[in-house]
């Protein structure tokens, strides 16, 4: 169920909806704080022992996803470019490149753990 307000989420949950999908960025565009609204919905469900799960949607950046995960909202529908923002990190990329280079120095260029013969 597409959700824009906490009361709408509460009513959907009382009617038996399995999931309520607050559209975070669209809520922001309506002049409200989409992250806060989503957290309020999560709290309403928990405080009222409702089985409906929050399925957050419509993100504009990876920080929004991370903030909701830190709050305990782990279900989300996320665009590929936002997912890339969650996993892309230059320090990690550099470390992986260094590990690969070190491994290839020991085993030969293009070798991986799956195609390296120990014997």
Give residue spans per PLM region.
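Catalytic cores of alpha/beta
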Residues: 5-15, 60-75
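Short His-Asn-centered micro-motif
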Residues: 1-2, 57
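Glycine-rich phosphate-binding active-site loops on the catalytic face of alpha/beta enzymes
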Residues: 2-3, 16-30, 72-92
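Alpha-helix-loop-beta-strand connector modules within alpha/beta enzyme cores
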Residues: 35-54, 98-113
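Conserved active-site and cofactor/substrate-binding residues in soluble primary-metabolism enzymes
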Residues: 32, 36, 60-63, 94
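Phosphate/pyrophosphate-binding betaalpha-module
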Residues: 6, 11-14, 18-23, 28-45
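Shared catalytic-loop signature of beta/alpha-barrel
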Residues: 45, 53-69, 77-87
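Flexible C-terminal active-site loop/helix
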Residues: 77-119
């Amino acid at each position: 169920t597409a959700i824009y307000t906490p009361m709408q989420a509460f009513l959907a949950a009382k009617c038996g909806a399995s999931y309520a999908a607050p559209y975070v960025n669209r809520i922001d565009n309506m002049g409200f704080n989409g992250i806060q609204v989503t957290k309020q919905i999560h709290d309403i469900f928990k405080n009222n022992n409702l089985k409906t799960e929050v399925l957050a949607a419509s993100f504009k950046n990876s920080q929004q996803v991370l903030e909701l995960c830190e709050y305990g909202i782990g279900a989300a529908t996320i665009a590929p470019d936002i997912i890339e923002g969650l996993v892309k990190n230059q320090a990690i990329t550099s470390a992986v490149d260094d590990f690969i280079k070190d491994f290839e120095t020991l085993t030969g260029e293009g070798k991986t753990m799956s195609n390296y013969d120990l014997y």
